[in-house]
Amino acid sequence: MSNGRRRGFVILIAGVALAFALRALPLYWSSLPSTLDGFDYAWLAKTATETGSLPLTQRADNLVFSTYLSVVSLVTDAVPVRAIQPLATVVGGVICFVGGVVARRVLRDSGSSDGTATAVGAVTATLLAIQGLFLRRTTVPDEEILGILLVITLAFCLHLALRSRLRRWWLVVGLLLVVFPMTHTFSTFIAALVVTALVVRHVSVRLSLRSVLGPGVLAVAFWAYMFSYYRFAESSTTLSVPYVNRVMAYPGLFLAWLILLAIGIVWVQQTGRRVKQISYLAVVGSFFGIVGLNAVSPIFPGTTQTPPLILGLVAILGVFAVTAAFGLELFESYRGGAIPTAMFLAPVTIIGFGLTASLTPEYYDTVMRAQTFLHIPAAMLVGVVLVRLLQAASGSTAGRTLRLGLVALVLVSTVATAPLAYLTMDTATVPSTTYESEFDGVRFASTHTDSPWLSDHSLTRVGANYFKAQVGYSAVANWLSGGPSPDCLVISQRSWTTTGAHLFPNAPETVSATAYAEWTATRNVVYANTGNDPVVVSRPVGNATCAAATNRTV
């Protein structure tokens, strides 16, 4: 093994170790899930381990992740609600490793030397480990974390299957396509777009009846299977289906973007490098523009504005994004470049659809989720640029210093975005997780009373997802805005007087410490605890009837 290749493997191991460490950091604050959806999967896994069967009363795309969590809980003898965050840590670290391995293969197939390919793979894994937005999405314990891993694997295996026509690769592709709809709906849409892009690119290179019928039928069959599964799940069972209704609301628009994807995958790999760079910067610049404008006024009515701290960290990410523009030659090779090209254009298609469909919180969520998948090919492009700078001919001392300075700038600025993974996006506070004190308060209200209770968005989601409590937060939001005190059991927190109560998708609302103390003094406090964010459970004095009993808006 050459010295360069050995150094590359050392960097890869160090980068993956860093990925695991950063994704384990939420466990420092709490062993509970760092995302509210995680409590729903924990409930599903808990029910499955206790009864021996998975409840078919939730979403149609959480079957694989919930089953996986159930198995891990049984094997480790851990309660699912405590096992889910460590599981996410492991899967998130594996994603970075797989991303690095795929990047190495892409460079090798594009004609780079073994040492260069290994170096790019190592840098890619390290960038994925530390880049703030990607770190955030590969730290939270939900089914998308499996979806991201499967999308990378599918793109790699399908491209090899199309190139080699070997049966073993087609078997792996077939297995992946079967499990996608049951794993994560949004990732399934990304996967379908990746399949479409790779098939179109393959046909454009090897135009023949065989190339059109074989891979073309596969792409059409997967789209048909995906929609058929979700239609069956929605109409024939008690399972719910997210995201699909957003596409079906504008089918013509989605088809138009699908056609643009098919044209784009061929155009990108045949057009000039300067045109590609301008087009890339326009696409990426639109994302930064949206975040910036949202800091002034919500782009999507009814959603919260971007906090200044979040805006600053995202702006720093611009160094990473601009650097990627100088590695776009990676898109030019069919043998290797088709993989990152398809993985880039697939989420761009979803982002374009979301921005042109409707200015609503649902489509805002669609755009934000799609950008996660952009970071994988972008990290490969940045890896190419950094390795090129490091391997450039020595030249003058000033030239070497400049190149090392540019590499340091990219790495330091990327590390500086890491806090994005741990911040609560609407309040820009750390950590973005559920404290033990919060969970204890929710457990008390949910298990010691049969009556409905109220709180902010975060705590009501925990109650509804894990304890299946009857909850709501509209009356609390009304009180925080100057309305009457809620006539129900309320879980309140000290943070309501500082960072505010979470009322997603609306902006947080605060109450003064004095007003909060006076309010709790006028109610019967039935539970209180201490901790990082003390919780108080109180009910109104007298025999007030909870008017919000039917309010289940969570």
Identify the role of each PLM range.
Residues 1-426:
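Membrane-embedded transmembrane-helix bundle of lipid-linked glycan/lipid transferases
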